[in-house]
Amino acid sequence: MNTPLRVGIVGCGVLANAMAGHLARQPRPVEIVGCLVRDPGRARGALPCHGSWEALLAQRPDVVVECAGQAALAQYAQAILAAGVDLVPASVGALADDALRGALLEAAAAAGARIRIPSGAMVGIDGLAAARHVGVAEVLYRGTMPPVALQRYVSGPLPERGLAFAGSAREAVARFPKNVNLTGTIALAGIGFDRTRVEMLIDPDATANVHELLARGEFGDFHARVSGLRISESSPSSRIVAGSLAQAALGSGFLALS
């Protein structure tokens, strides 16, 4: 296929640049048509930047990947979808907001666009989605991270070691908006934000972000585990997240939100 895939990005940080690097190495030609940032003059990196969603959409992207946080997804996603452009959100946790999710689905349906949910830092998302058709009774996500991966992104004290949080996926994405977007993907693939249980643990000896997914139901049960190295010390995201965003942008390996 010789026609370049035109990709727009919301954000221009570490995750966005890592994903763009993966896209640049694909056999299919890919053109990054621009990044949407608050202040194009302060943007770092070599990617072209725009200061408004109108300017980004004027570049005629085939797909837009959001890499800028839950607030950015809430601000720009509806306009992107209403323009008939597919959206790949990194900040899937924002979709715990039922009103926002409903508005985005309505905009996508009206314009013939899709919301492509990436697998993120976890394996087994496709299996969980398949198991849902048979019957899923319980889903648990357990994340174990070094203190630096959590402490700078939340307000309030956290323990030095051990259990930092236990609750629903809906509660988790509110408590850790930059760290547990993966739980949003798991909730959407499985049994929802209120029934999906989340445990967050801190381990000062950890050298990677460890993600575990446990599910049980009429299909049987499974336990998936990923030990993901972070993109950099300045980013809470695992390296595989950038790969999953690139894969979803290219048109495979994603959950179509409906």
UniProtKB/Swiss-Prot annotation:
Spell out the InterPro entries in the cross-references.
Answer: Asp/hSer_DH_NAD-bd (IPR005106), Asp_DH (IPR002811), Asp_DH_prok (IPR020626), L-Asp_DH (IPR011182), NAD(P)-bd_dom_sf (IPR036291)
Q: Which GO terms describe its molecular function?
A: aspartate dehydrogenase activity; NAD binding; NADP binding; oxidoreductase activity, acting on the CH-NH2 group of donors, NAD or NADP as acceptor
- Report the catalytic activity: L-aspartate + NADP(+) + H2O = oxaloacetate + NH4(+) + NADPH + H(+); L-aspartate + NAD(+) + H2O = oxaloacetate + NH4(+) + NADH + H(+)
Q: What is its EC number?
A: 1.4.1.21
Binding of NAD(+), residues: A121, N181
Keywords (alphabetical) are: NAD, NADP, Oxidoreductase, Pyridine nucleotide biosynthesis
Query: Superkingdom of the source?
Result: Bacteria
Keyword Lipoprotein on this protein?
Answer: no
Q: Sorted alphabetically, which Pfam families does this protein's record hold? A: Asp_DH_C (PF01958), NAD_binding_3 (PF03447)
Q: In which pathway does it act?
A: Cofactor biosynthesis; NAD(+) biosynthesis; iminoaspartate from L-aspartate (dehydrogenase route): step 1/1
- Does NAD show up as a keyword for this record? yes
Record GO biological process: NAD biosynthetic process
* Enzyme active site: H211
Enzyme kind, highest EC tier: oxidoreductase
Q: Which NCBIfam families match?
A: PRK13303.1-3 (NF009828), PRK13303.1-4 (NF009829)
Q: What function does this protein fulfil?
A: Specifically catalyzes the NAD or NADP-dependent dehydrogenation of L-aspartate to iminoaspartate.
Q: PANTHER family attached here? A: ASPARTATE DEHYDROGENASE DOMAIN-CONTAINING PROTEIN, L-ASPARTATE DEHYDROGENASE-RELATED
Family stated for the protein in its record? Belongs to the L-aspartate dehydrogenase family.
Miscellaneous section: The iminoaspartate product is unstable in aqueous solution and can decompose to oxaloacetate and ammonia.
Q: What is the protein's name according to its record?
A: L-aspartate dehydrogenase 1
Gene name for this UniProt entry: nadX1
